Amino acid sequence: MRQPASRFCLGLGLALSALTALAPGPVPTQAPKTAKREALPPAREIIDRHIKEIGGREAILAQTSTHAVGTVSMPAAGLTGKLEAFHAKPNKFLQRMTLPAIGEIEEGFDGTVGWSISSLTGPILVDGKQLEQRRFDADFFEELKAPERYESISTVERTTFEGRPAYKIKLVKKGGEEDIEFYDVETGLKAGSVSTRESPMGAILGTTVFSDYQKFGVLRQPTTMKVNLMSQQMIMSIVKLEYGTVDPAVFTVPPQIKALIK
């Protein structure tokens, strides 16, 4: 699950692994409200404005890796823990989260092998549709929305997302799967996304809200991400983000995962 929406690859999968460990509790969510119809800007124009607002295409393409450090909390359960994420081009990532009562959860993709390890499940080798989704989500330059990765990208409507005017965009991937993204009308920045990702429990629909954009180096990134799924909420906050400092060895597949590869 990554929500695939930021360069440090904090996705739905990591949140799902933690949230499924707790009993569900109601989380109020603010559903998008449809506004009156009007002439809509092309989706490509909306996406390109976001790219410009966070630093520009050239600045994004100049990066080779990111290392993010932050905190993660689950308000309904009263839990707060640590978060760390590594991401490198073209499509490698490692995410690590530690929470009281749940322990450490790791997810990774080395460009070929997808895996997860937690104290709850032990080592798991990701395959099938989950692996396909992880490969897609791991794209280091996902923010650019390269046309060749999609069947179509279109503006659906102007609506309200988290209390603010937003453009709703539908992204249809090769193969037919769809993601929805929301872009703030006033700031041009990506405000959130709605996506479905496969899990051991089946397909899970999740909503991610991006906020508190801050500049790290030459690029702006959202420092707060609220993930809502399965009637639970997880809040991830980034306090430090570095570019170009990741050792490639960090993406090495762990021994306990290698033991599962046939």
Name every feature range the model reports, one short phrase each:
Residues 44-122, 148-160, 173:
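N-terminal mature ectodomain segment of secretory-pathway/periplasmic proteins
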Residues 133-168, 189-192:
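Short, conserved active-site entrance elements at the starts or edges of catalytic domains
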Residues 21-32:
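Signal peptide processing junction and immediate N-terminal pro/mature segment
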Residues 9-21:
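Bacterial N-terminal signal peptides
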Residues 29, 98-100, 162-257:
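Gly/Pro-enriched, hydrophobic low-complexity segments
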